[in-house]
């Protein structure tokens, strides 16, 4: 379980839908803003595809709340302040310093069905998640 920007405890154990869990390096940075806004702009499509969307970085709830409000995000940002979720999902640090950018598509049974890694191309994460969710609908 992990808190989001509003102090709500989140766990995928209660979800009945697929989950797109995307790890991004830091709030209020140019590349991360492009990525989170990309997920925001396609949020209705994610809902049509039956998926939840959660973002994760090591920012605290105040940082996430400000970032979410500024960018009008409709989905939760999880506060992984001690990198515990990042470690569970084995999200790498680039050069041992910069938090990686990785997206996981988790099916409704809780299985990771796809992992997409690309530090520099945040928008590709959205396209890849949508592609995989469409494939899951055809199973």
Where are these regions (language model features)?
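Chalcogenol-based redox active-site neighborhoods
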Residues: 1-139
């Amino acid at each position: 379980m992990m808190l989001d920007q509003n102090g709500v405890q989140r766990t995928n154990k209660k979800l009945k839908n697929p989950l797109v869990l995307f790890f991004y390096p830091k709030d209020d940075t140019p590349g991360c803003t492009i990525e989170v806004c990309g997920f925001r702009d396609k949020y209705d499509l994610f809902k049509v595809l039956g998926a939840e969307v959660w973002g994760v970085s090591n920012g605290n709830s105040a940082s996430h709340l400000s970032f979410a409000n500024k960018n009008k995000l409709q989905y939760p940002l999880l506060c992984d302040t001690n990198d515990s979720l990042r470690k569970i999902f084995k999200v790498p640090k680039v050069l041992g310093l910069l938090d990686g950018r990785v997206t996981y598509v988790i099916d409704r049974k809780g299985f990771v069905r796809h992992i997409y890694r690309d530090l520099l191309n945040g928008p590709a994460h959205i396209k890849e998640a949508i592609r995989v969710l469409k494939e899951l609908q055809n199973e």
